Amino acid sequence: NDKVLYHYLGFLFFNFKAQTPFRDIYTQWKALNSRDKFLKDIQHTIATRMLDRYLEETEKAAPDYQKCLKTMTEAISDFRENWYNNDKELYQILILLDIFRILDSKSIKKLPTDYFTRKSGQKDGEDKEHILSQTPRKDNGEITTIKTDWEKFVQSEDFKDIRSQMQDILNHSDAELTEQELIQLQNLLNSAGLNSIGNMALLDLRINRSYGNADYTHKRTIIFQEYMNQKYVRPHTLAVFMKGDIDAREATGIPLNRWTLEDIKRNTDKIAKEIGKNFNAWLTQNN
C-alpha cells in the first residue's frame, strides 16, 4: 500500500534484476527496520545503478557518482545528442519520469507492473515515438526518398532555422534522393534536436500505428481520445502531448496545438533538471 516504495522497488527490480536479488532487498529491509532509511537506500541504489554506465573501467573501484551525474545531465540537456539508439537508458529515464509524475499527483493511478520496463510484443507492446516527426514517411512507415515529399516537409515552420540548408541539399538532388542525401538531411534534423530525449516518448504500438506519419496535432487528438476511452497512456507521454505545463506555455506564447523545436529544447532542459535534482538528492541523502 506504500505508493512510493511500490514505484521505486518496482523500477529497481524490473530494470536491474541481475544486480538486485529479492533476498538481498528483503535482508536490507529487515536490517534497517525503518521505512525511511530503506527508501533512501533504494533511491541511492537506483541512482548508482543508472550512473554505473558512465564509469570508466579505472574508476569502478572508487566511483565518483557526482561526476557521472554531471556527464549524464549534460548528455540529456544537449538537445543535439542522439538518444534514438540508446534504448536501455532512454527507456529507463522515460519510465522514471512517469514515476515522478505519479508520485507528484494525487489523481494519477499507480504504474501497472508491466510498465516498469518498455512493454514488448507485436500486439500490446510499446515503442519510442518522435513527438515531432523526424522525417517524412510512406504509409508503411519507411522513410520516403521522393524529393517532393521532402520539399513539402521542410516547409514546416518547425524547421525554419535549418530550412535553407535542407533546401540546398534538395536543390542539387534528382527526383529520388540518394542514400547520401538522406543521411545529410537526417544529420541536419538531428542537429536541430529531432533525436534528443526531449523529442521522445514511449507509446503503445497500437496507438502509434493508428495514425501513421501524422502531424503533432493529429497525434495529440488520437492520444487524447485513447486516454478518454480508458486506454492506458503513460503519464509522461500524456503530459508532453497534452502540454501540461500551461503556465510556461502562456509565458512563451507557443501554441498548444504544435510541438516545436523550442518545445524540444524546453522539454530537454526540464528532463535534465528533474533527473539531476532527484539523483543528486538520492546520492547525498545518506551522507
Predicted region positions:
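Flexible coil/loop and intrinsically disordered segments
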Residues: 1-287
